[in-house]
Amino acid sequence: HQDGTPLSVIRADLRREVPLTELLDALPDEPIEFADRGGFETSDTDYAALVRTVIDKEIGQGEGANLVIGRKYRATVSDWGHDRALTVFRRLLERERGAYWTFCIFTGDRYLIGASPERHVSVEHGQVRMNPISGTFRLAGTATQAERKQRLLEFLADEKEIYELFMVVDEELKQMCEICHEGGLVLGPYLKPMSHLVHTEYLLAGRTREDIRQVLR
């Protein structure tokens, strides 16, 4: 990763499927309070300046096309530990929908908790799947169903959103062609609804003879 974070590999010693209701019954439900609600590490002004620099010097000069500029938000939770982490995990399971993977991982020195909408790549019995996602339509702020439909149609017709989705599909198709000996199949576009927003997405499918480690490389 560009920030220097080392890669971590999870080796599963036990895998088990349980009904969601049973899992929720087993998970704690502790109060979550903040010792410090914190804020963004980068101010709005500095972030806007960084975006402008990337547009002018990277995208504008042909050095890149699909770039994501990170912005970290830091806060401190009171009495943080296993029970609080599992409570956050529980709330994601209860309140988020449409996630590809809802996870809670403890590495020994940090927790990784989230609900990701996107599968980068999966391989099962030689079947490769990729899931390029783009576009974010927020469901908040629409008073009626008719208003939401009108805003969604305008969002889907926006050239910026259309080209951005094409761009991420093109990038992942290039990767698919490198690992799949027969090329890839493009399915979509689709809408991916979640609890508070809707994404646009494609599904890519292909077959590979490569070892999973080579696919990840």
Predicted features and spans:
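An anion-binding catalytic pocket shared by soluble metabolic enzymes
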Residues: 71-162, 178
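Short, well-ordered alpha-helical packing segments
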Residues: 52-55, 89-93, 153-156, 173, ...
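Phosphate/dinucleotide-binding and metal-coordinating scaffold of catalytic cores
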Residues: 54, 110-111, 192
